[in-house]
């Protein structure tokens, strides 16, 4: 299941239920706000997003959001409200996190899929897309840091779409691109995924892990598409070299299934941490709004007093 879709999937998306149209408007508004665009439309409903929680179609400028995942199957459309209102966002943090991730694709994944496919083979293209997932969050959290905890609230939906069901070296590189890269992006903290990072580093070795970290760091910072193409090639070359050296089923106790479970456990804990952080963030924003309101009223009172003095 992909977030960024460059071609139409088999079968058209069903038309959104009429009762979700108003929510679709507010999802589009929030996506445009976070992506710094004004052309994005949204398709929202219980059957939207083609099996994913959410996805973005660059060629349609369309975001799709699965309401069962984003809001929960028991949430009625009229209960959602205006998602551009910060107060409403705290009612549905998972939905806002999914929308923010897709909005960051809309904002930063402004590259040609056909050009990239011409430059890279299929394996390199997959590596490019893997690295792109954390790059957009790295870029986005610099521009819109407020949404970090919302994205963390949806971290399982964003990450486990790419659950690594492969062997050894492939699994280690996949998890490095999903988890280690998001630590470097600032979405996750290393202490939260210490077990996962440790397993991957132990298997790959310190030298290779450092090399991959360098690729990720440069990819995150790069605004040059051709440079990112080359980094994807380097990623795949490093993976092939590692597989040749270690073999696909080396000794040493590395278990891809156990690693996948460790990822899931860590991300579940992160969601809990994010919910606590969001409660604190909401309280801070309420307090800031109160202080601002008092300041504005004080200024207005002083202006009124000054005007009264002029009259008398």
Predicted features by range, described:
Residues 179-312:
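Negatively charged
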Residues 1-168, 172-190, 201-205:
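Basic/hydrophobic alpha-helical interface regions
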